[in-house]
Regions:
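Histidine-centered catalytic micro-motifs
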Residues: 59-71, 229-238
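A structural motif
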Residues: 119, 149, 227, 286-287
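Divalent metal-coordination and catalytic microenvironments
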Residues: 13, 25, 30, 54, ...
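Active-site-adjacent C-terminal substructures of enzyme catalytic domains
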Residues: 261-293
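Alpha-helical scaffold segments that flank or form the walls of functional sites
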Residues: 74-125, 130-150, 181-195
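Metal-coordinating catalytic core of metallo-dependent amide/deamination hydrolases
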Residues: 132-271
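N-terminal metal-binding scaffold of metallo-dependent hydrolase/deaminase domains
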Residues: 1-43, 55-57
């Protein structure tokens, strides 16, 4: 029996996104090693074939912002049809009681749904770390590896709870030192670099209003030190804009820049309520947007 991964011809697709691959592609160990033109056969010795005549051949889709754990509560009736802040306060107490087995189930369900829709790469933003979810990212790494998903797992965080005037219960809030220490541990343990990396880590304070300014600044510094990316929610609702102006005396993007986040290392979730000047600034900085209204 051969010890190397099999060479597979994905043969004669119904349609292909690349005309040079109208006859399919030859793959081995997760890589395309040959594109086959229409009416041709592979030059490479093939060990198995997959009949793609009823399939469309295209690159895997990429989901740039997800919350795997929320898969379990997407039909939770008390939270339906609510604006962001009331929706969050309704669900935080539910999420605070999730455990690692439930997170593993939610992550598997979310990733299988993505794979079935043609999505092979996903960025997940997990920021709920109760006592039962201390190793949430470790659980997600294991699940992603088992399913063969390329995962950019962002280590989220919340350091401002209800006792400090925030939205989440104290049971899911962590202190800044714990957040930074755990972020460092996860990067050192799991972050892969270079072509073909299947698991990468990013730092992802939940939002400007759920963490301290200190954590925003220190996360940016740690990301630069470790050469990883930054992710957070920004400009998702008008309520957020008003909250930032009241709390910080500036708009969300100005606060982002003041904390060292406005760079090409950063991509933001939502990004709905930017004015024209802010859109131009984002473009000049090379900051990405996962635009999901």
């Amino acid at each position: 029996m051969s010890s190397h991964p099999p060479v597979t011809w994905i043969k004669h697709p119904l349609a292909a996104s690349d005309p040079d691959a109208a006859g399919g592609v030859v793959v081995q160990d997760g890589r395309i090693i040959e594109a086959v033109a229409a009416g041709q056969t592979p030059r490479t010795r093939v060990e198995q074939t997959f009949d793609a005549s009823r399939h469309v051949l295209l690159p895997g889709l990429v989901n740039t912002h997800h919350h795997f754990y929320q898969t379990l509560t997407r039909a939770y009736s008390p939270a339906l049809n609510k604006e962001l802040f009331p929706w969050l306060t309704t669900l935080y107490d539910v999420w605070a009681n999730l455990d690692e087995a439930q997170l593993a189930l939610a992550s598997e369900l979310a990733m299988v749904e993505l794979l079935m829709s043609g999505c092979t790469t996903v960025a997940d933003h997990h920021y709920v770390f109760s006592g039962a979810l201390e190793h949430a990212i470790d659980v997600q790494v294991e699940t992603a590896r088992r399913l063969g998903v390329r995962a950019a797992l962002t280590r989220g965080s919340m350091s401002v709870g209800r006792e400090q005037g925030g939205l989440p219960p104290q049971s899911v809030v962590q202190d800044e030192a714990t957040i930074l220490d755990e972020s460092t541990r996860l990067i050192d343990a799991y972050h892969q670099r270079g072509e073909g990396a299947m698991v990468t880590l990013a730092l992802a304070p939940c939002s400007p209003f759920s963490v301290s300014r200190e954590l925003m600044v220190d996360s940016a510094r740690l990301a630069e030190q470790k050469d990883v990316r930054l992710h957070t929610h920004l400009a998702e609702t008008e309520d957020e804009t008003q909250y930032c102006q009241k709390l910080f005396g500036m708009r969300p993007l100005d606060y982002l820049e003041a904390t060292g986040w406005l760079s090409d290392r950063t991509w933001l979730a939502h990004g709905i309520h930017f004015n024209d000047d802010e859109v131009a600034r984002l473009g000049q900085a090379g900051t990405g947007i996962a635009h999901c209204p």
